[in-house]
Amino acid sequence: MSFQVLHLIGGGEIGGAEQHVLNLLKNFNQQQITPHLGCLVKNSPFASLTRSRGIKTTIFPMRFPLDIGPVIPLISYCRTHKIDLIHCHGARAALLGRLTGKLLSLPNLSTIHSWPEFDYTSVWKGRLALFLEQKTQPWSSGIITVSDALQTTLRSGTKPSFPLRSKTIYNGIPQYDFSEHQIMRSSFRQQWGIKSTQKVIGTIGRLHPVKGQIYLAEAIKALSQVYADLHLLIIGDGPLRSELQNYLTANNISYTITGYYPAAWRALPAMDIFALPSVSEGMGLVLLEAAQAKVPIVASNTGGIPELFNHRREALLCRPADSESLAAACKEILDNPDLAKVLTENAWQISKLFTIDRMVKDTTNFYLEILTDKG
């Protein structure tokens, strides 16, 4: 018997959560789990991607953040396709999925990829998202967090009277092919007009305050006084793009902002350092990709990041929201090739532990635990 599982996600961008969902959908054992996908954004780029990969995807468009109108077509879909379980990703999906589950007496669970309070540029929207997350938790059959740090935060805000079923399941990534590392390095540098002699500090992610790219820009400004051939490579797009461009241009910093780039992992060999300056981070899927590419890593010591890497063993971890700490860590790697080599080798070994097979197996077992209890 194969259980029918509907995954719900906003799908307005293609970030770590979307990549996580895609990896799950492509790798479930179809004899156990038949996955369905629903996106909540009308012109969803993620839906376009999944459809191009042959994944059946349905749009349940939300007209505004608290629009519960899609619950009606969701109920119809669940009945028609005999859905056994709804798996929600993100605050909006959790609101609709939990409400649909409650109305149908249908099991539902959520994966918390990042803390909802920090997912919005607006403070009040973040607080509202957190309020709704906590108020609708009693409607949930279970919650997955992608790090123990998120698990701790989750439980600290949960009422003791609510018997929360929750589990940490770490993200997994495919084994990417970096065998032509030098060719990839030269190709992407040429594509973006980066000189072969330049030292490149790069990052990948949505351009959002929680990702802390402004602190990386400030660090590069300081480092540019020491290294004349430094270049900042930012792969991603988002609401902070104009602000970052204005800052970098005003300070005469050599930089490239590519915008959204599919399969951005391929560009990692173009970097001499990968930096993740997040203010808050659930886990940091891209860190595992950088580790596979054997690019030295500098990252904020926040959220689930120190669960992946130890400071000075696999990466240099710095204080979040601190450009001076970030600059000092980057400088240490630039000045010490032997340290960089040790860090990359150790991080590469760690990255091999975070497989998709393990993530899919743990997720499937959690489904079965919930569905067995229901039965």
Each model region followed by its residue ranges:
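Conserved acidic donor-binding segment of nucleotide-sugar-dependent glycosyltransferases
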Residues: H311-R312, L316-S323, E332-P337
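A conserved mid-protein helix/loop that constitutes part of the nucleotide-sugar donor-binding site
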Residues: G15-N23, K199, T203-A222, P239-Q245, ...
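Short His-centered aromatic/hydrophobic patch
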Residues: C88-L96, I112
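Aromatic "clamp/platform" in nucleotide-sugar-dependent glycosyltransferases that forms part
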Residues: Y260, V279
